Swiss-Prot record:
It comes from Deinococcus deserti (strain DSM 17065 / CIP 109153 / LMG 22923 / VCD115). Gene3D superfamilies: P-loop containing nucleotide triphosphate hydrolases. This is Uridine kinase. Its main location: cytoplasm. Pfam families: PRK. Keywords: ATP-binding, Cytoplasm, Kinase, Nucleotide-binding, Transferase. Pathway: Pyrimidine metabolism; CTP biosynthesis via salvage pathway; CTP from cytidine: step 1/3; Pyrimidine metabolism; UMP biosynthesis via salvage pathway; UMP from uridine: step 1/1. Its EC number is 2.7.1.48. GO terms for cellular component: cytoplasm. InterPro entries: P-loop_NTPase (IPR027417), PRK/URK (IPR006083), Uridine_kinase (IPR026008), Uridine_kinase-like (IPR000764). GO terms for biological process: CTP salvage; UMP salvage. Belongs to the uridine kinase family. It catalyses: uridine + ATP = UMP + ADP + H(+); cytidine + ATP = CMP + ADP + H(+). ATP binds at residues 14-21.
Amino acid sequence: MTGHVRPFVIGVAGGSGSGKTTVTRRVIETVGGNGVSVLNQDNYYRDQSDIPFNARLNTNYDHPAAFDWPLLRSHLDALLSGVPIDMPEYDFTQHTRSAQASTVLPGAVVVLEGFFALYDEELRERMHLKVFVDADADVRFIRRLLRDTQERGRTPESVIQQYLEYVRPMHLSFVEPTKRYADVIIPHGGMNEPALDMLSARIRTTI
C-alpha cells in the first residue's frame, strides 16, 4: 500500500488472570481507542467443530498446540499491511470456534494479548515492545475462577480441576519461561499503577 506506515506492535503476555486485559486497556487509553487494533489470543484457539462435544470437554486450553498459530500470524501480517481482518470468536461453552467474527481495522498500534503472546518466535519478531504481566499464582487463580464461572458457564469444581491438571503445570512449563523475552515486566499484575504509568510513558516516546 503506497505511503502505508507499518503499525507499532506490542505483545502483552502473562499467566491467566494476571491482568493482561487491564494493561491492554491502558495502552488503548494512552494511544486513543481508534488508533489501536487488539488481537485477543483467546479467539485463536483451533476450530474443533469436527470433534464430538464430549471429546472437546478434554481440551487442554493451556498448551501451545491448542492455538491456530498460522491464522494468528496471517491476521497480524494483514494488519501490519493495512488490511482489515475478521477475527474469529471462540465459544467456550461449546469448546469450539463460533460462527461469528469481529472485524478488526488496522491501527497505528497493534496489541497481541494472550498468555502465549510471547511464545511464538515468528510473532515475537514482529513485535516492537514485549510486555509480561506478572502476578502471584493465588491471585491469578481467584481471577480465573471468577471469570470462568461468571462468563464461561463453568462450575467451580471444573475450574479447580482444570487449574490443577492443566493451568498450573502448563504455566510453569510454557508461559513463565517466556518472561525472558520481555522488554518490560509488570510486577503485581494489572493493578500496579506506577508500572502502568511507566509503560504509558514508554509507549508515548516510541510511537
